[in-house]
Swiss-Prot record:
Domain of life: Bacteria
Entry-linked HAMAP family: UPF0502
Entry-linked InterPro entries: DUF480 (IPR007432), WH-like_DNA-bd_sf (IPR036388), WH_DNA-bd_sf (IPR036390)
Recorded family membership: Belongs to the UPF0502 family.
Protein name (database record): UPF0502 protein PFL_4004
Biological source species: Pseudomonas fluorescens (strain ATCC BAA-477 / NRRL B-23932 / Pf-5)
Lineage: Bacteria, Pseudomonadati, Pseudomonadota, Gammaproteobacteria, Pseudomonadales
Amino acid sequence: MSSEHDTPGEALRLSSTDIRILGSLIEKQATSPETYPLTLNALVIACNQKTSREPVMNLTQGQVGQSLRALEARGFTRLVMGSRADRWEQRLDKALELVPAQLILCGLMFLRGPQTVNELLTRSGRMHDFEDSEQVLHQLERLIARGLALHIPRQAGQREDRYTHALGDPADIEAILAARSNPVERSAGGAVSVERIEELEARIAALEERLAQLEG
């Protein structure tokens, strides 16, 4: 690929920890506005969730804190001073001039990597009201045009194309693409259970958020 929009500039390169932090902040801003911005402890818990995260990570407060400060210096996060605890919020939407729909799609791709349009539509249900898959695709195409997302043509054995963000380290992105080149496709019978899986993940995420509130 040779287009000037194929990849973002060096200023937008993000580490895997940066990506997880931003994705978690975007998610919690949309799903748990009553506890957002997040304390450092709550953010670490969000980053290390066992559900709705691919891959699952085990970040420490030190790692998250260091990345937050680096992201703040680049205008992607902001520390909000509080009387009881300091909290963190994402500023990616303002830094990159993203509309809400684009921010949510970026957040989902940050947290779960390459996904189909239908997966993004289903998983965004708690965060943004897309009318249909065409709206999702339209916003993905706008992100691709700006070099912020990538289109992954369907591979042998796959039924649909996939989309992922383009803000990570090039080596990490190549590894993701390689790992996804021959995935085990869900069977037709298993497709019915996707919504059930998403429902269970949402319930577990809600419990983890309550735990974060108690500990934060």
